Regions:
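Primarily recognizes Gram-negative and organellar outer-membrane beta-barrels
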Residues: 1-182
Length: 182
């Protein structure tokens, strides 16, 4: 965050700016066994998440005193935020321990990998592949203008104040999930 300020007899300026960026990737690999009376069940999963966020915010303040009876204050600000997210998840359930057949069952969870060659087909109960995407953008701009004039030295004033605001938000999401039973 950056701040600045300056002042003269008739003019006072100040403001700040902030920029933020975040990029996070998470990969999770799982394997579990359920102990059931009707027979054990085995599950394997892969998940990858990627999230990116960018943000910018700035505000400004100007106070002008053209004479001893008048002051004008102008305060604009703007902010922008952008986010992007993506995730891929693959999972499978088996009626026998898949490690009896292959070294890494998690290599056989993606539909593309098991279409032509599936060494776990005889023990596979189901497989699920999911894809999710999201994005959003947000922009806002605001400003306030105030004009103040003393009418006399006894404390009477007249003030005019106006404000402006603009906002634009947009977000999109996409999700696909497919489960196949064997």
């Amino acid at each position: 965050e950056n701040n600045f300020a300056t002042e003269t007899e008739k003019l006072e300026l100040g403001g700040s700016m902030r920029y933020n960026y975040r990029d996070a990737d998470v990969v999770t690999v799982g394997s579990s066994q359920r102990f059931l009376q009707s027979g054990d069940s085995y599950s394997n999963s892969n998940k990858a998440n990627s999230n990116k966020e960018t943000g910018f915010k700035a505000d400004f303040r100007m106070e002008w005193r053209p004479d001893s009876m008048t002051n004008i204050i102008f305060r604009p600000n703007v902010s922008y935020d952008k986010t992007r997210g993506a995730s891929v998840a693959e999972s499978g359930t088996f009626n026998e321990d898949p490690y009896q057949y292959v070294v890494n069952p998690n290599d056989y969870l993606n539909f593309d990998n098991i279409e032509s060659d599936d060494p776990l087909r005889d023990t596979r109960i189901n497989a699920t592949n999911e894809h999710n995407l999201s994005k959003s953008n947000s922009l806002s701009a605001n400003a306030t203008l105030q004009l103040n004039r003393k009418l006399n030295n006894e404390g009477r004033n007249i003030t005019f104040r106006g404000s402006f605001g603009y906002g634009d938000d947009d977000s999109d999401q996409y999700a696909q999930s497919e489960t196949r039973y064997y």
